[in-house]
Each structure stands twice: as C-alpha cells, then as structure tokens.
C-alpha cells in the first residue's frame, strides 16, 4: 500500500529511482559489498549483485556487466500480494519492507518478476534493496552509489529536473528489465545489453560460475548435476541464439553476437514446494464434497440422508483444516500466522483467501454440529431441516470461493506467467467437482450411501474428469501462451523435467485410468463400488502430480 505522507514522513512529491550507466561499470562488485556491509545482509543472499554475461566466440568476445537489484517499481506487484503490508510503497516511491510484519509466506518472491526479494536466513522474513532508506531520509545517498569508483550508479529524485538522474534520463536512451510485466520499473540502464536484460536468453542451471560453486536448484542434486539431469547444457555452456522461436531475442548479425553465456549471477532457489500443491488438492476435495452435497440436496438430485450429511460435513471440516495446516506449515514464520487476520492487506488474495477459508470452515462446522445433533437425536430433525437450506445455499458460494481463490492469488504472482491463465478459475472449479465426486465414491465403499447420491457422484466425477482432461490438454497447454516465459514453463511440464508427472501421472493415472475403470464398471454393472473407488484414488494421485508440476515448473524459469 502507499503510506500517507504523515505516516511515512517522506515527501510525496518525490519519486526516487536508479540509473545504471553500463558505459562506466567495471564489474568490481564494490556495490554488492557496500550493500552487504551497510545493511548487514547475511551470507548466501544478496540485495544487489553484478551479473556477468559473456558474448561472442574467441577471439571476438566481450563481457557485459549488469548491476541487478530491486527496481522500486511504480506499480509494485510485491506490495499488492503481501497479505500483511510487510511490503509497502512509500510516498516517495521507495518500495520498503517491514520485517516485524512479515509472516514468511514468500508470495512477494513469486510476485517479483526480477528475483529481487529473498528470505533472510537469520530472521525468516522477506528482505531486499530498500534504497538505503535510513540514509535517504537524512539526505545521504545509498551506500552503493557512494562506493562506486566509476560513478556508474546514479540515484535521485526523478521528479526533480535539476537532479543528475533526471538529466541522464532526458539525454540518453535507457532500457529496463521486463517492461511487458507492467510494473513500471524505476531502475534504468544506459547501454543495457539484451543478453543480460533477458534472463531466458540462456538456460537457468549453469555448469559453473566464476568464483562460485553452482548450487543445485532442487534438493538431492549435486552441484552442476542439475543441468545434465534436465537434459540441457545450462548457462555455462555456450549456446546459439539464432532461433527466435526458441528464445525471446535475436542478437545481431555478427558471429560474436550470436553466442552468449552467463559467467556469474546470484543464485535463487524455489520459494514454494510440495505443501502448496498439497493444499490445492485438500481444499479442492473439501470444497467439492460440500458443493456436490449442497447442490444435490438443494436441487433434489437425491434425497437428503442424515448419515451422509454428517460424514460429508466432518470430511469437509477436516480437509479445510488440513489446508490451513499446510499453509501455516509453509510459512517461514509460522508463529505469526495470525498476522494475516490481525493486520490484513485487503488487496492480497492471500488475505482474502484466509477470510474465505475461515468463513467457510465456520459455516460448515456449525452446519455439521447441527446435522450431527439431529442425527444423534439431540435436536429435533424438523428444526434442523428448517435451517438446512440456509446453510447449504450460503455455503455454496463460499465453497466455490475456496476452490478458485488461488487462481486470483496466482494472477497476482507477476513473476510466474504460466499461473496467470484466464482459464485457471474454471479449471480449479472443475478439479474441485472431480475431487468431490471422487471422495463420495470412496465414502460409498465404507458406508451405504443412498443410490441416487452414489449415481450423482459418479456422474459428476466422470463428467468432471472429461472436462478437466479437455481443459488441461487443450486449454492450458494446447493454446499458444501469451508470453515466452509462460511457454517455457509449459514446455517444462510437457517435455522437460516434469513430463513424467504430467503424462504418466496426470494424464494416464489421473484421467485415462479412472475413465477406463468407470467404463469397465459400467460394462460389468459395478459402476459404483470398488472399481469406482480405485478410479477415485487414481484421480487424487493424478491431481496432486499435476498440481505439483504446475506449481514447480514456472519456478524453473529464471527471473534474473
């Protein structure tokens, strides 16, 4: 959020930015060292660093330097997605962070298209370049500006026409990183090099770096082994970039400009791992169970059954509770999880989603208690039947919200283009119906559900399986993507590291096998029974494997 002037204590007429003059930069890393010293940045993470990119073939070679850091965007996505206002934009345009408010959800890292944010290993909170705000507020320049021996870093108020930065911006043609993301970055480069500005010009995992070991991107990998495992040469290998269908840019016409490799860069690991796809599955199942039962009873698809209501209610509550537990488990500061309710930032779909989850849990919990009391004879069944439609119809939009709110959260993750699919809300809703139908089929194996309920569940399950298969193959991966970054992530799922998760896990195990089992059950007359339950289990496993690939693959694509 933008802080009011009286709270931030800064001049709202100012707009601070940086200019990096690549004509002067010698790649000495003095700025990186000064930043670490001034801000006490721990080892292993960086607020500013110098990226080295080499182009050409010996003897026609050249090394390009690029000082990389937070862009202090005029339209910062990290601020919008932060659920507790730990990331905020000052009135003078500086994007600042408040470590005391951070819960370590890592959403800001997914929202930043520049890899500028990291989790401090000592505090477990998000941090980044903050324009040395403690110095700026007393009239001093950032430490990196002061220490640069070539005056290659220029900082100042871009709204002041007499400032050096304003004059440089007026006189020189400048470039920024990823202008297509719509963040309006305020870190400008004079003589910016295309190969350095575009992180997708080379593969993410290099074979080696100057002065640094290459850390594995994934747990269990050894050093540079990640590149071989992925079947690519990595950034350390010299690669031709003439094919514009494969890479986003085409470098000149000379031989020396058609080869590129990254000699040094700061290394970044994936912020989100298995708990996120697991929570997508658990909340989808819980919401799907309630939606199917609520719609079925409300629209008279099947008669109400007290035992089915009790079991459906407790399963929904437990699954949404497990969803909440997974979300808290994934926080780097889980002890602060209540901050999302005590100091919410309402533009964030993390904050909105938390309220939806809590509201849905409370409503379903009360409904389940009433149904349990009526089924046990503690309350008159007629009294509960009177209020039942109110709970079911109020719960339906909340259940749909639980199923799809993550699509809007992913849309705020500006650093992961594949997640910003306009089909994602519908896709998550279909997956929820599929998972809910599968849950009822497993329930039917252990308890005698009314036949109409079982048939409704298997019908919804089959239709949702077919719809999900169509949306996955045609909608998400069959239609050209809007950006090269999204296309690379989709390629990673279809043909790269996650191809087995996708084809054998999602498509074969999660869709083809369940549909085949349902067909066999229909032919032999066992449409509802153990065959359907096995199909449901296959669908659950396939759904998790798909969500795992969908969450992890976009994080493979580098942002810096």
PLM ranges: what are they?
Residues 1-9, 53-69, 100-101, 109-111, ...:
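Flanking helices and flexible, charged tails adjoining ferredoxin-like Fe-S electron-transfer domains
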Residues 1-95, 100-105, 109-111, 115, ...:
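Ferredoxin-type iron-sulfur electron-transfer modules and their immediate structural context
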Residues 181, 186-191, 328-338, 555-560:
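Membrane-proximal soluble regions of multi-pass membrane proteins
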Residues 214-220, 240-302, 548, 553:
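N-terminal signal-anchor module of multipass membrane proteins
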Residues 273-274, 278-285, 299-304, 344-348, ...:
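Long, contiguous internal "core" modules enriched in hydrophobic/ aromatic residues
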Residues 292-295, 301-356, 363:
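Membrane helical hairpin/interfacial module
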Residues 326-336, 406-418, 547-551:
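C-terminal ends of transmembrane helices
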Residues 474-483, 550-560:
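A cytosolic-side transmembrane-helix exit/cap motif
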């Amino acid at each position: 959020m933008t802080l009011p002037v009286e709270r931030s204590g800064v001049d709202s007429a100012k707009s601070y930015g940086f200019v990096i003059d690549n004509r002067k930069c010698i790649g000495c890393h003095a700025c990186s060292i000064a930043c670490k010293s001034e801000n006490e940045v721990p080892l292993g993470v960086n607020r500013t660093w110098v990226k080295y990119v080499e182009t050409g073939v010996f003897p026609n070679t050249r090394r390009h330097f690029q000082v990389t850091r937070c862009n202090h965007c005029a339209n910062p996505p990290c601020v919008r997605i932060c659920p507790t206002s730990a990331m905020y934009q000052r009135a003078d345009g500086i994007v600042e962070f408040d470590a005391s408010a951070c819960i370590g959800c890592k959403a800001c890292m997914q929202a930043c298209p520049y890899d500028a944010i990291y989790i401090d290993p000592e505090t477990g909170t998000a941090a980044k370049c903050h324009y040395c705000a403690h110095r700026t507020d007393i009239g001093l320049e950032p430490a990196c500006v002061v220490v640069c021996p070539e005056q290659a870093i220029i900082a100042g108020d871009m709204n002041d026409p007499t400032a050096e930065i304003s004059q440089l911006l007026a006189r020189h043609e400048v470039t920024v990183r990823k202008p297509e993301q719509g963040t309006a970055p305020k870190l400008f480069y004079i003589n910016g090099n295309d190969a350095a500005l575009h992180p997708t010009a080379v593969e993410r995992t290099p074979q080696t770096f100057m002065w640094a070991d290459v850390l594995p991107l994934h747990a269990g990998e050894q050093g540079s082994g990640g590149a071989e495992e992925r079947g690519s040469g990595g950034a350390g290998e010299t690669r031709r970039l003439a094919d514009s269908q494969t890479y986003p840019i085409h470098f000149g016409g000379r031989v020396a400009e058609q080869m590129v490799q990254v000699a040094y860069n700061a290394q970044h690991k994936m912020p989100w791992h298995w708990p996120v796809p697991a929570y997508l599955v658990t909340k989808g199942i819980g919401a799907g169970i309630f939606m199917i039962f609520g719609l079925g009873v409300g629209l008279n698809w099947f008669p109400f059954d007290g035992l089915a209501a009790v079991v459906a209610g407790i399963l929904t509550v437990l699954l949404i509770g497990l969803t909440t537990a997974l979300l808290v488990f994934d926080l780097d500061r889980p002890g602060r999880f209540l901050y999302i309710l005590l100091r919410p930032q309402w533009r964030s779909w993390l904050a909105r989603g938390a309220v939806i989850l809590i509201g849905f849990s409370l409503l379903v919990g009360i409904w389940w208690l009433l149904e349990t009391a009526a089924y046990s004879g503690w309350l008159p069944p007629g009294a509960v039947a009177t209020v039942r439609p109110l709970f079911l119809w109020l719960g339906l939009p909340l259940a749909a919200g639980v199923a799809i709110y993550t699509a809007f959260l992913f849309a705020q993750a500006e650093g992961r283009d594949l997640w910003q699919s306009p089909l994602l809300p519908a896709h998550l809703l279909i997956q929820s119906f599929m998972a809910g139908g599968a849950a009822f089929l497993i329930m039917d194996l252990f308890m005698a559900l009314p036949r109409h309920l079982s048939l409704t569940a298997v019908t919804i399950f089959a239709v949702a399986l077919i719809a999900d298969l169509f949306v996955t193959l045609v909608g998400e991966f069959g239609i050209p993507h809007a950006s090269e970054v999204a296309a690379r992530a989709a390629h990673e799922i279809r043909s790269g590291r996650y191809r087995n998760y996708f084809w054998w896990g999602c498509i074969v195990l999660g869709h083809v096998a369940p549909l085949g089992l349902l067909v066999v059950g229909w032919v032999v007359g066992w449409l509802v029974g153990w065959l359907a339950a096995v199909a449901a289990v296959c669908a659950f496993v396939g759904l998790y494997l798909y969500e795992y690939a969908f969450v992890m693959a976009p994080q493979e694509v580098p942002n810096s």
